[in-house]
UniProtKB/Swiss-Prot annotation:
The modification Phosphothreonine is found at residue 131. Substrate binds at residues 10, 12. The gene is CTIMC. Homodimer. It is an enzyme of class 5 (isomerase). It catalyses: D-glyceraldehyde 3-phosphate = dihydroxyacetone phosphate. InterPro entries: Aldolase_TIM, TIM_sf, TrioseP_Isoase_bac/euk, Triosephosphate_isomerase, Triosephosphate_isomerase_AS. One of its GO terms (biological process) is glycolytic process. One of its GO terms (molecular function) is copper ion binding. Its EC number is 5.3.1.1. This is Triosephosphate isomerase, cytosolic. GO terms for cellular component: apoplast; chloroplast; chloroplast stroma; cytosol; mitochondrion; plant-type cell wall; plant-type vacuole; plasma membrane. The keyword Mitochondrion applies. Keywords: Cytoplasm, Gluconeogenesis, Glycolysis, Isomerase, Mitochondrion, Phosphoprotein.
């Protein structure tokens, strides 16, 4: 079964209500491949989720950028998976490298979050990736495998999981993993899933690439056999996000 191309736009901590409306209008007017070719998910900051959800075109979906690890309660400042479900938000991004690095989220904590979110009915974009120091030390796959294992130890059904490989050294830096570098890690990650989870999960789970993806490099990256789409940061706030969505066509013609 072919894996449907997936393009996620992570708006991070950006935007005003007016800016968000402009971005949504641009997306709503865009001519992009149909839903059977590409799945598009955008992830605005929490405060704009209802606005985006109510105004975004029906063939695009909305994701939160994070959620709490368990049921809500006395956790000031947190948002629970149940609240997202209540708002009819279908997706959530978990384990983003910025949260791992700045907020000290461990792989085990991320794994717990993924398992809890899935149990509440959310779909999860689970992020993994290595730092520049780890890559230069030759430990890329050790790091990525350990991060993935923390999820695999807690998750049995992978049908609602998309893995986002995001080399930390390429996020917001303008540095991009070459198509060959991205393909190598995606291929190794798929082999890890086959060996440690199941051949079926390895064959069907989408592994997307994140790290300075833009309109200029998306087609070559997307053309790699094991790159099933993108998690886009800065470029998702710009019109070139539409070009990145259109890169899904490379799979159709492959």
């Amino acid at each position: 079964m072919a894996r449907k191309f997936f393009v996620g736009g992570n708006w991070k901590c950006n935007g005003t209500a007016e800016e968000v409306k402009k971005i949504v209008n641009t997306l709503n007017e865009a001519q992009v491949p149909s839903q059977d070719v590409v799945e598009v998910v955008v992830s605005p900051p929490y405060v704009f989720l209802p606005l985006v959800k109510s105004t975004l075109r029906s063939d695009f979906f909305v994701a939160a950028q994070n959620c709490w690890v368990k049921k809500g309660g006395a956790f000031t400042g947190e948002v629970s998976a149940e609240m997202l479900v209540n708002l009819d938000i279908p997706w959530v991004i978990l384990g983003h490298s910025e949260r791992r690095a700045i907020l000290n989220e461990s792989s085990e904590f991320v794994g717990d979050k993924v398992a809890y979110a899935l149990a509440q009915g959310l779909k999860v974009i689970a992020c993994v990736g290595e730092t520049l120091e780890e890559r230069e030390a030759g430990s890329t796959m050790d790091v990525v495998a350990a991060q993935t294992k923390a999820i695999a130890d807690r998750v049995t059904n992978w049908s609602n999981v998309v893995i986002a490989y995001e080399p930390v050294w390429a996020i917001g830096t303008g540095k991009v993993a070459s198509p060959a570098q991205a393909q190598e890690v995606h291929d190794e990650l798929r082999k890890w899933l086959a060996k440690n989870v199941s051949a079926d999960v390895a064959a069907t789970t989408r592994i997307i690439y994140g790290g300075s993806v833009n309109g200029g490099n998306c087609k070559e990256l997307g053309g790699q056999a094991d790159v099933d789409g993108f998690l886009v940061g800065g470029a998702s706030l710009k019109p070139e996000f539409i070009d990145i969505i259109k890169a899904a066509e490379v799979k159709k013609s492959a």
